[in-house]
Amino acid sequence: NLKKERNNLDNTAVVLGDESLLIPVLNSLPENIDALNITMGFPLKSIPLASLFEQLFQIHKKTSSSFYYKDVVNIVSHPFIRPLFYESGIDKASEMIDIIHENNLIYISRDRLKGFSKTNDNILALLFDDWNTVDSILENCSQLILTIKNGLDKNKTSNLLSLEYLFRFNVLFNELSHLNSKYSHIKTISTLHDVYKELLHSETLDFQGEPLQGLQIMGMLE
């Protein structure tokens, strides 16, 4: 029992046969565990934040001027996005989803989306404004990361892992910006998406800890 064995974990290791189990294990560790060493990397593509940017690329690659309602619901419900719509204890994301369902909306224009929540129009703009150029896409993604970070910083100690995710994705988009400035072949959103995926699949999130102290978490090959 990890809760009871706080002072006797120096010789304890958790061995994971599947790297995808790492994040669920970290999220379920008792709060009393204050020393931890993780010796396995975690693929950046498997981090929850990756699914958000994949959804954004997919909706903006379509040429339609409106969005399918399920795509809108999935994005505003994303665990990294939904907290941005909390206002004075009110879940504005839920209110938007209710409007969509109550009015049986199938396709939703950008203007109508912005009308759902005037106080959150800056966030809606980051998510749903037209991605006209590669430069504007990269700027939007960087601003979105910063906006999410500002929200998480309000309770930093409880969001250390999520903030680490954001840092790594910020590095990734900075690298994309560097490649876009250095080379001239990234002309379309589809090309940018391909380069993004190539970088994403080559990166891992590496953790640091004290190798001689606390609970050890490792993969089968460690």
Predicted regions and their residues:
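Polyanion-engaging groove/track-forming segments
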Residues: 1-222
